[in-house]
Structure formats: structure tokens, C-alpha cells
């Protein structure tokens, strides 16, 4: 699982099975319970400074560009895995928190 906690929150977890992510208070959180597939239309609909959080996997379309993600300041959190194309792998590695791994998708 995945726990999202705002930095100024007073909430304290004493026991947890999964991954905890602390986020800035001004970040827009888009939570998805299992898996989310991200494409250009999805990114265009996100607000600036959005954290895409999935309980399991984030799957980013191969046509996504680093510019599209950085223009909106999109970050990712996944309980398991984030998958993306080689062209944005560096951006995704720097801007993701995962419970398991970040992998390059085969085209």
C-alpha cells in the first residue's frame, strides 16, 4: 500500500505495511487505488504541481516527453512500480517514490 502524508500534518504512523510518502502542502494529489495509465491527455488535465499516486503501478505512455511532465511539475508515487519509456526515464527516476522499482518499458 501507499500512505500519503502532508508535511505539516500532525498525523504519525506507528505501524505500517507499505510505503509512506511525505508531500508538500501545496501539491495537488491525484490518488488511484490500483493502476493508472498516463498519456498526454491525462497530463494536460492535471493541475500544475500534481503528484500522481497509485496503490500499485503507474504506467506512463511511451509518447510522453520530459517537457510535458516538467511543464506541469508532475511527480509520481507508486506502491509497487513505475514504468516509462527510455526518453523520460531520468526524469521519472528523479521525480518518483516507489515501493519496488522504476522500469523502462519496451517500445
Give the predicted meaning of each segment.
Residues 56, 61-62:
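Conserved mixed alpha/beta catalytic, RNA-binding, or beta-rich assembly cores of soluble enzyme
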